């Protein structure tokens, strides 16, 4: 799927401290370096502290198509909501069309979330990222990344693992086993 400009667009809605920014960077690099797409990834956040809203934007297109837009993603093909409470804010669901996929970190079922999201059509994927992160001693963002990769369907999980290893390996090599388990469970359990 592409929009009228030739891009597949993704938006993450999160809270500072949950790792959406680094998740977007890993996903963007996996698409560009691992899968051969052209792409971009950037985040928008206020005061760079835990608890404040964070939005991450990712665009992919074919290798022969330049990425010439740096504006926020307004009509994502995939929306990932890193904290269920963000649903209460009206702008989280802005631009979601009937064919969109929404991935939510929640204990609720897709049927329970659909009216909350005011989403009459489209695909809702749910992952209890907090529970899995606690069980696997990792962060929510790694579990969400696995779920997002599964929902996308066009980025290889092994490529994401490789990029995550390169991102965290030098500084946090002792945590990579936990991060990989979180990625795997996010991918399998959405």
Where are the regions that the model predicts?
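Active-site cofactor/cluster-binding pocket
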Residues: 1-190
